[in-house]
Structure formats: C-alpha cells, structure tokens
C-alpha cells in the first residue's frame, strides 16, 4: 500500500511541478516565423494569409502555421473573425460549432464574443483541452489583429468553466 501511495505522490508532485513552470520558458520557446498578413490577388476577391496557433502533437505547446482565408480583407469584422475561427476549428484548435457573434478593437485591446457552442465544447474538453483551445484562440487573434489583450465573452457575458474564470482581458499564452 505504501508503494502505491509513494507512486501516487510522485505523480502528483511531477504534475504540480510541470504545471507550475516545468515546461518551456518564454525564452526557450521556439519562436514562430514572422509572417504578417499578406494579400494576393485572386479571382473573385482577395486572399489573405493569417497566422494560426494550434496544439502540437504532444498537446503541451502551440504550433504556428499560416492559412489562406479566401475572399477576405484583413479587417476587424465578424466575417473575417469567423473565417479565422473556421480555420482553427479545421485544425481542431477550437470546438466544433464555435461562432463569432461580435468583434471590436479599441487601441491594442480586442473584444471577441463567441456563441454557447464554444463554451459547451470548452467545458467538455478537460483542463488541458481548455488550455489549448484558449491559447489557440487568444494567440491567433492577438497576432492577426495586432493587439496585446483579448477579452473573450460568450453571448456578451464573462464566463467560467470550472477550471478558470474568464472575466478579464487575456494576454498571449506561453507554455
């Protein structure tokens, strides 16, 4: 019995150390290559390149890649924000059914209002899934809208998941 308790204690301590900073420091984190949004002419509109952040295979860090948003101008509009959201969903970086209800920018602060499907998926994802979803969402929107904070709401209200309260603006997630 003591053997099992010792093993359990060792696992809990390892997990606690990992969560408290045993991961990569911001200085050690591999920086994503700088790829500002670009526009290329396309038949029927403008294609915009945007940077997406999504979980790596080990689900312990975020990986950055670029995606093309067809027929979209990079602007603070619900349509452009939804196009980015759909790219994140396609990379399993946001819950299916997530939709942008509203977006606004005031200086370097972005406000993003999402639907109940986003919150339901977030609550079902567990603590690691929640961290990856929120990190993907926040880092992607910070990068593409050149902001320092994102306030995320659901149906216009702050929300909680059981793991975290989301009632304040969020800054970039680092792991």
In which residue ranges do the predicted regions lie?
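Bimodal "functional hotspot" detector
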Residues: 2-13, 18-175
């Amino acid at each position: 019995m003591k053997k099992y308790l010792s093993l359990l204690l060792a696992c809990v301590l390892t997990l606690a150390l990992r969560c408290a900073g045993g991961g990569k420091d911001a200085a050690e984190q591999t920086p994503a290559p700088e790829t500002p949004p670009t526009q290329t002419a396309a038949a029927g509109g403008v294609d915009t390149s945007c940077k997406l952040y999504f979980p790596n295979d080990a689900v312990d860090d975020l990986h950055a890649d670029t995606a093309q948003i067809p027929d979209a101008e990079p602007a603070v509009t619900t349509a452009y924000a939804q196009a980015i959201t759909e790219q994140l969903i396609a990379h399993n970086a946001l819950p299916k059914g997530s939709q942008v209800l509203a977006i606004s920018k005031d200086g370097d602060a972005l406000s993003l209002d999402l639907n109940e499907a986003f919150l339901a998926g977030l609550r079902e994802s567990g603590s690691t899934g929640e961290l990856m979803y929120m990190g993907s969402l926040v880092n992607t929107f910070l990068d593409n809208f050149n902001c320092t904070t994102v306030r995320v709401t659901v149906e216009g209200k702050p929300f909680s998941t059981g793991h975290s309260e989301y009632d304040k603006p969020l800054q970039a997630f680092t792991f």
